[in-house]
Design a protein with these regions (language model features):
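Mature extracytoplasmic or otherwise solvent-exposed domains
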Residues: 1-182
């Protein structure tokens, strides 16, 4: 489940593995962005966002008989800044540059039972943002993206490993500074 609102600046993600499947994994992502056309012939664009976030995640790997090779699960959350530029030939946006800021990464193996954790914080902290070179002929889509990954592998028919990750973000402001280079 994922949602994003440019109007409110809120992002919400929830990702959960299918407990009936032996192997399952996937990403949930949501983002908000802005379109920018540089006002200088050549310049450095520095994209920044002001955000607060809260996360919760859980892994439950039940015990299995000693003859079973293993069962494991992992989850992680990240914030990403992404710059996409319009390709003048195709007219499509193409990813030019991205920066990932890890929030957490956890894993568990057979029989570790229920593990849950959470946290909160603010972005950018010490992160310098995302800088890209461009000019007045370019059009950029600059994105703030929240992403969670969950994955599991069960190797016993009755094992029901559960892996879940939730991430909520509030992004009240995003901005771009243009520094002329010509």
């Amino acid at each position: 489940m994922k949602s994003a609102s440019a109007e409110t600046g809120r992002l919400h993600l929830m990702n959960l593995t299918d407990w009936t499947a032996h192997t399952a994994s996937g990403y949930a992502q949501a983002g908000i962005g802005i379109l920018v056309r540089p006002s200088h012939k050549l310049c450095r664009l520095t994209f920044r966002a002001d955000a607060s976030y809260t996360f919760r995640h859980m892994i439950d790997t039940p015990s299995v008989p000693g003859t079973v090779p293993w069962s494991r699960a992992c989850n992680r959350g990240t914030l990403r800044l992404v710059a996409q530029r319009v390709n003048p030939v195709t007219g499509a946006f193409e990813t030019d540059l991205q920066r990932s800021v890890p929030l957490w990464a956890d894993s568990a193996a057979t029989g570790s039972t229920l593990f849950a954790d959470g946290g909160h914080g603010t972005y950018p902290g010490a992160d310098p943002g995302l800088s890209v070179l461009g000019g007045s002929a370019d059009t950029f889509a600059l994105w703030f993206i929240a992403s969670v990954f969950v994955g599991k592998e069960d190797h016993y028919r009755t094992n029901r490993t559960i892996c879940q990750a939730n991430l909520d973000c509030a992004v009240p402001a995003m901005w771009v500074e243009q520094t002329p280079l010509s």
